[in-house]
Amino acid sequence: MKKNRLLLIALLLVWLAPSFAARVDTLLVKSPSMNKEIKVVVVTPDAALGKKAVSCPAVYLLHGFGGHAKTWIEIKPNLPQIADEKGIIFVCPDGSTSWYWDSPKDSSFRYETFVSSELVKYIDGHYKTIADRKGRAITGLSM
């Protein structure tokens, strides 16, 4: 009887305990300058979700040459946990093989404009960010 009661209490505690888990979204974000959609992975901490959401800083993580939008999630699988622990929104755009610059000859390669302007506006408009340059950072692999 005591074992059953203890098991029931343990199950209730697990069931009633709040679960905190960052949300990982894979999006297609329209780039007006390139006239195409770019894949972007956004990791949103629990703090920036729901009715009591607070504004969180956004860190833009750029992959290295040959990478893609999911590279950071693959090499750092605990990124959602870090997002929750630190209260950071991680934004991981697919930069293709662009080196994140604007080509003067090819209008389909304007990744600097996309990352520094278009994507920032999209993220600030769709996520609970600190919508100011003081609330943003950018870094990457092999930069």
Positions of PLM-derived features:
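Hydrophobic h-region of N-terminal signal peptides that target proteins for export
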Residues: 10-20
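Generic detector of short alpha-helix boundary/capping microenvironments
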Residues: 9-10, 30
